[in-house]
From Swiss-Prot:
GO function term, MF aspect, one: ITP diphosphatase activity
One GO cellular component term noted in the UniProt record for this chain: cytoplasm
The protein, known as: Inosine triphosphate pyrophosphatase
UniProt: Mg(2+) binding residues: 42
Family: Belongs to the HAM1 NTPase family.
Residues engaged in binding ITP: 12-17, 54, 70-71, 87, 145-148, 168, 173-174
EC supergroup of this enzyme: hydrolase
Pfam families the record matches: Ham1p_like
């Protein structure tokens, strides 16, 4: 009997994201996680719909089980914007620009949302969502991982960027979504 785990392809070209996902999933994850950068169109719409469609498109290219992620940073004062477009807002405005977007508002609250879409080969994607609530603050900490320097989770005095990786990986939006995925994948098949 083979002890080899089935392969699950995580569709990302982001090395930081891959390291974080592997650290969160841990050695007991029932799949061998491999990453692959797949050229997917930039979709627009609601985050769960974006994640599902990216998953469908990736599954066609990979021809196997896939996992895709869509991350949002949602400002409550802006009714959820920039949301799934955070990557582009950050690229164009920088960390200071994200803060400037809220300059006219008293409400600096926000939530980080991570949606993982998982599809076994030939199946419809399933969605797993995690959210962490916090606030937008002037950038603090290393600027090597997206918007982490401007997001301070509720109950903490540090931004994601200032936190030890172990701490962040126990409270983050990504952790919460991956825990839901893990729970789904290790649940008993029959009832």
């Amino acid at each position: 009997m083979s002890s080899a785990k089935p392969v699950l392809t995580f569709v990302t070209g982001n090395a930081n994201k891959l390291k974080e996902v592997v650290a969160i999933l841990g050695a007991d994850f029932p799949f061998e996680l491999r990453n692959q950068a797949v050229d997917l169109p930039e979709l627009q719409g609601e985050p769960a719909d974006i994640a599902k469609e990216k998953c469908r498109l990736a599954a066609k290219q990979v021809q196997g089980a896939v996992l895709v992620e869509d991350t949002s940073l949602c400002f409550n004062a802006l009714k959820g914007l920039p949301g799934p477009y955070i990557k582009w807002f950050l690229e164009k405005t920088g960390h200071d620009g994200l803060n400037n977007m809220l300059a006219a508002y008293e409400d600096k609250s926000a939530y980080a949302q991570c949606i993982f879409a998982y599809a076994p080969a030939g199946a419809e994607p399933q969605v797993f969502v995690g959210q962490t609530h916090g606030k937008i603050v002037p950038a603090r900490g290393p600027t090597t991982f997206g918007w982490d320097p401007v997001f301070q989770p509720d109950g903490f005095e540090q931004t994601y960027a200032e936190m030890e990786k172990v701490t962040k990986n126990q409270i983050s939006h990504r952790y919460k979504a991956l825990e839901a995925l893990k729970t789904h994948l290790v649940k008993p098949v029959d009832k």
